């Protein structure tokens, strides 16, 4: 049985990716600015993760026990307590695209926090990514650069 990496905090996730933690509850990672290749691993996360994939990936990314359906210019959503990633086979990946991380504590006590379970794109059942137009992709990038 493969070991699953436990990443409970934003700092732990950022340390794994080799990037600086600027806030304990939220992080934006621009893949092209990652300082070094990162080893593949299956990860159990304690935060919400939203990936903007700009390139088509040929490796299988699993979310739970299923493969994620994604091409280029897609958003992928991972909920706290879920497992995702690639098999830890000794290979590495280099950054591309963007990643937004936010801890559930950021939303605790807010109207949005009380309704996060209503957003089904964060569930295992929703293993199909949200495909974006170039204009939608640019809007997302503009927002991420402001966080």
Feature locations, PLM:
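Short aromatic/basic micro-patch
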Residues: 44, 77, 101
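A hydrophobic/aromatic-rich effector-binding and dimerization subdomain
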Residues: 10, 20, 87-147
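A structure-centric signal for secondary-structure junctions around beta-strands
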Residues: 47, 72, 94-96
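Generic protein-terminus/edge-of-domain signal
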Residues: 1-62, 66-69, 128
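Short acidic-glycine-tyrosine-enriched beta hairpin
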Residues: 65-79
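Generic short beta-strand segments
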Residues: 33, 81, 146-147
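Histidine-centered metal-chelating micro-motifs
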Residues: 58, 76, 80-89, 107-108
